[in-house]
Amino acid sequence: MPGAPSPSAPSIALNDENTMPVLGMGVAGLSDDETERAVSAALEIGCRLIDTAAAYGNEAAVGRAIAASGIPRAELFVTTKVATADHGFTASREACKASLDRLGLDYVDLYLIHWPAPAAGKYVDAFGGLIQARGEGFTRSIGVSNFTEEHVSNVIDLTFVTPAVNQVELHPLLNQDELRKANAQHNVVTQSYTPLALGQLADNPTVTSIAGEYGKTPTQVLLRWNLQLGNAVIFGSSNAEHIATNLDVFEFELASQHMDAINGLNDGTRLREDPMTFAGV
């Protein structure tokens, strides 16, 4: 286990007067045991944002690790997400309550619609349920995940409420430049998941060369690039040493030519499902 906790990540302002750490850890794909160990390690190291989802099946494990940490609830930022099966006004509100029960928490800091699943046509109703959940104190902030510019605009136009966050696939191969601009116009924070492109850039010559110049790992360079774009970022790991390394990205800054070089890797490669056609989880 790494030693002293690293400094907590800086925070970014949300459009609802709340704040969120710009960097945190997600637990997608981890078993209960892996989740409990990873979250415990992350919290001990200094991470304060933990991202889970109903569809991950590990909310209870996240809750156990949080409870065991002894860290005051107010110091943590916990995100979870509503599954597509629970789209709908009443269903999404009830799903939030069920997530709280599994987490063992009185509230979450951010509740997201996991996927728009546009063919089902219920994501706007689901967001209405999130508005209700926020009003009842189940969540501090509400947002969306995997939403396109069209989906975000529909939610705003039909509910008159702007999501605080849009969490999307975003990495140098898919830098989401247009979507980031659209989010910013709505004052929606863009939060990147898969910032490491599922390992596909670990040996990329551009990335490794830049990492060598700064004495950093390719992972640190990829996270730093994302943060310098102005995004919030969620990384995934079950390894305590990797978690510590991933959190240690606030003591250096990439020069503009290196940012440009990484931007040049963008070729539109999508590693996760297409939000326009995916039926969701």
From Swiss-Prot:
Assigned EC number: 1.1.1.-
A molecular function annotated in GO for this UniProt entry is:
aldo-keto reductase (NADPH) activity
Question: Which CDD domains did the record assign?
Answer: AKR_AKR5H1 (cd19134)
Record: residues binding NADPH: 196, 234, 237, 245-246, 272
InterPro entries referenced in this protein's UniProt entry, alphabetically: AKR (IPR020471), Aldo/ket_reductase_CS (IPR018170), NADP_OxRdtase_dom (IPR023210), NADP_OxRdtase_dom_sf (IPR036812)
- State the top-level EC class: oxidoreductase
Catalytic residues at 56
Q: Show the Gene3D superfamilies listed in the entry.
A: NADP-dependent oxidoreductase domain
Matching Pfam families: Aldo_ket_red (PF00248)
Q: Which UniProt keywords apply?
A: NADP, Oxidoreductase
Q: PANTHER family recorded for this chain?
A: 2,5-DIKETO-D-GLUCONIC ACID REDUCTASE, NADP-DEPENDENT OXIDOREDUCTASE DOMAIN-CONTAINING PROTEIN
- Indicate the family of this protein: Belongs to the aldo/keto reductase family.
Protein name in UniProt = Aldo-keto reductase MMAR_1744
